[in-house]
């Protein structure tokens, strides 16, 4: 499938889209290179609740039939996690359905993430990534942040500044 057939849009999730979003999250998590038991144990902590989604900006990628095949969620980033004197949005989650991975959908979702960040007039986007996902974000212009407070800060934080016109 060509990525032009995929639409990317911000949404206000309802019950049906919550289920569709969580199907994408479940498929992505179950595709991780971890022991099956570990994936089953961690999966519930990655699934979204309706209450959580009300406090997040939600962006979905849909195929032409309307099926959700990717999701990105954003929230304000804590000041301690951002580079010094910077304000940012935290990319809370970025998930692509396994059958749609490696087709540019993650990049398209990130493009919309940066449009949201630009509109919010923040300095950049912060990611707390799984170690295996770091190369994906580095290839898209993110830089690894060295923890200044290893007891408090997540080890795999990445930052990309919002380009101002």
Residue ranges and their predicted role:
Residues 117-130:
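Conserved GNAT acetyl-CoA-binding A-motif
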Residues 100, 104-112:
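Conserved acetyl-CoA pyrophosphate-binding loop and the N-cap/start of the following alpha-helix
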